[in-house]
């Protein structure tokens, strides 16, 4: 019986060693998974920062060019207003005189299609 007891003890010890090895393997696996997850998260964060930087750089270049366009449009608008203003002052007297001549110098005439009937 002692040999059976000794055999059972050996089996129990072997079972315990196997259980310990399994637990240690699970711990190593969990540790590797955690480490892989942390590395993936770090890579994702790094990629996100890179893409956000690219986006900001492109956005700045586009918005900057739009700002330049706004300045150019403003300059062109001012130039056009000055041109129209100078044209107005240049031709104002002549146009006013033509309008007054048309209003005051009336020449009554019969229409060419008018037929006088008696």
Swiss-Prot record:
* Listed Basic and acidic residues bias regions: 14-26
Entry keyword set: Coiled coil, Hydrogen ion transport, Ion transport, Transport
Query: Got a GO cellular component term for this one?
Result: vacuolar proton-transporting V-type ATPase complex
One GO MF annotation is: proton-transporting ATPase activity, rotational mechanism
Renumbered to this chain, the Polar residues biased-composition regions fall at 1-12
Query: Which InterPro entries does the record match to this protein?
Result: V-ATPase_G
Ranges for the region named Disordered are: 1-37
Q: What start-end ranges are recorded for coiled-coil regions in this protein?
A: 3-53
Superkingdom as given in the UniProt entry: Eukaryota
Coiled coil keyword on record: yes
- NCBIfam families for this protein: V_ATP_synt_G
Q: Which family does it belong to?
A: Belongs to the V-ATPase G subunit family.
User: Quaternary structure?
Assistant: V-ATPase is a heteromultimeric enzyme made up of two complexes: the ATP-hydrolytic V1 complex and the proton translocation V0 complex. The V1 complex consists of three catalytic AB heterodimers that form a heterohexamer, three peripheral stalks each consisting of EG heterodimers, one central rotor including subunits D and F, and the regulatory subunits C and H. The proton translocation complex V0 consists of the proton transport subunit a, a ring of proteolipid subunits c9c'', rotary subunit d, subunits e and f, and two accessory subunits.
Q: What does this protein do?
A: Subunit of the V1 complex of vacuolar(H+)-ATPase (V-ATPase), a multisubunit enzyme composed of a peripheral complex (V1) that hydrolyzes ATP and a membrane integral complex (V0) that translocates protons. V-ATPase is responsible for acidifying and maintaining the pH of intracellular compartments and in some cell types, is targeted to the plasma membrane, where it is responsible for acidifying the extracellular environment.
Protein name per its UniProtKB record = V-type proton ATPase subunit G 3
